[in-house]
């Protein structure tokens, strides 16, 4: 099956408009943002925000959560860098979490997140078929 770039762009724009309207209807605190052509949704603090983000998460191919300890308590203000496999950063956010959803082109990426001086990294492949969920958890020593 050949995918046409114009059709792909229309589908992405339609999805993003749906995301924007859902987010706007939910709360003013949740804001879908676009930085250097990368659309993302960051937040999830409080039950209402968490529920909203979980409801629209399927629109994003890459979904991340950040937590600590054995009980998995959510954390925020986590610096995140997503790089291509050549090491070139394609997305950076100084204060992510506790949930971060990102739209990226299909490909293989390395996601690095830092909390309390410890960096965790995970590789992920986005194939355009199914979204991917990454969970970063910093357990107590």
What do the predicted segments below correspond to?
Residues 2-11:
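Bacterial N-terminal signal peptides that target proteins for export
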Residues 11-17:
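Hydrophobic helical h-region of N-terminal Sec-dependent signal peptides
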Residues 19-23:
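N-terminal signal peptide c-region/cleavage motif recognized by signal peptidases
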Residues 25-78, 115-141:
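Primarily secretory-pathway and cell-envelope proteins
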Residues 79-90:
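Short amphipathic beta-strand segments in non-cytosolic proteins
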Residues 93-94:
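Short hydrophobic alpha-helix segments
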Residues 97-103:
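Short, surface-exposed beta-strand/beta-hairpin micro-motifs centered on an aromatic residue
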Residues 107-113:
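A short tyrosine-centered beta-strand micro-motif
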